[in-house]
A protein has these predicted regions:
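N-terminal amphipathic/basic leader segments beginning at the initiator methionine
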Residues: 1-38
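Short, hydrophobic/aliphatic alpha-helical segments
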Residues: 4-8, 58-61, 186-188
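A generic secondary-structure signal marking the coil-to-beta-strand transition
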Residues: 5, 22-26, 41, 68, ...
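Short clusters of hydrophobic/aromatic residues that line enzyme substrate/ligand-binding pockets
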Residues: 9, 45, 197-198
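Short, basic and Ser/Thr-rich N-terminal targeting/leader segments
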Residues: 21-22, 65, 113
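Conserved N-terminal alpha-helix of the aminotransferase class I/II PLP-enzyme fold
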Residues: 31-80, 85, 101-110
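Conserved PLP-enzyme active-site core in the AAT-like
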Residues: 70-269, 274, 279-280
Length: 282
């Protein structure tokens, strides 16, 4: 068992300090009592903070080697929150091969509110650099794209972004922190549709944002609290439970897809296979 596997099973806040329970209980309360007037409390209203959700968020941050994590009601809610830190007139460079829901959010919502978008092939660093404008604030991309599995180097893009004082935002849904931890390669913000591999059982709709520093954490938390697209305590518990088997599931899924690709390569009816996990394939 590796250090990462141990993190999957033993979350930072797994034990409940109130009861001694070895797993975090599901706290359904919407409001929390003050011990006395004016006393500082960790939670007062569940939209702003919930013990079950917080335990999950701390686990997400640990898996991605981040400073703070935030759990949302869907992957799109997470993407919305990450992009909402920008303001009217800001310019973003985005990958030209991104999830369709992200494309729709960018071009039919955020552009309408004044965010400027330029799509480029993020595998081409020269194309990224040529797209940088005085008002450019960030580069957003998927390291392995949905659905054609085109591969972009997080390390190279992040290095270019740092040269120009830009944020690097990575949608790590397809790889998960088991296969890639973008923050360790220079990224600033990582996004997940936790509905997919993190949950793993097709029974939770969830999203996650993990950030590298406190300044970004404060900005994302403000958006999470203001917009209210939080993950429920029940779904937070289900997602935390699914995360425990992430490495086991992905190991089996990787082995299965290699067998499938080997089989498809022998079929004359199949003209092209997109799978970067086998040498020689795009």
């Amino acid at each position: 068992m590796t250090r990462f596997d141990t993190k999957l099973v033993h979350a930072p806040a797994q034990h409940d300090n109130n009861t001694g329970a070895v797993t975090t209980p599901i706290y359904k309360a919407t409001t929390f009592a003050y011990p006395e007037i004016g006393a500082p409390v960790k939670d007062d209203y569940s939209r702003s903070g919930n013990p079950t959700r917080r335990a999950l968020e701390e686990q997400l941050a640990a898996l991605e080697e981040g400073t703070a994590g935030f759990a949302f009601s869907s992957g799109m809610a997470a993407i919305h929150a990450a992009l909402a830190i920008f303001k009217q007139g800001d310019h973003l460079i985005v990958g030209n091969q991104i999830y369709g829901g992200t494309f729709r959010l960018l071009h039919q919502f955020f552009e309408r509110w004044g965010l400027k978008i330029t799509a480029v092939d993020t595998r081409n660093l020269a194309a990224i650099e040529a797209a940088i404008q005085p008002n450019t604030k960030a580069i957003y991309f998927e390291p392995v794209t949905n659905p054609l599995l085109q591969v972009t180097s997080v390390q190279k893009v992040a290095a270019l972004a740092q040269q120009h004082h830009l944020l690097t935002i990575v949608d790590n849904t397809f790889l998960s922190p088991y296969l890639l931890q973008p923050l360790t390669l220079g990224a600033d913000i990582v996004i997940h549709s936790a509905t997919k591999y993190l949950s793993g059982h097709s029974d939770v709709s969830a999203g996650a944002v993990i950030v590298k520093d406190r300044e970004l954490a404060e900005r994302v938390y403000f958006i999470q609290n203001a917009l209210g697209s939080i993950l429920s305590p029940e779904d937070s518990n289900e997602l935390a439970r699914g995360i425990k088997t992430l490495s086991l599931r992905l190991d089996r899924q990787i082995a299965n897809v290699k067998e499938l690709v080997n089989y498809l390569q022998g079929l004359g009816e199949v003209k092209k296979i997109y799978y970067p996990g086998i040498k020689g394939l795009p």
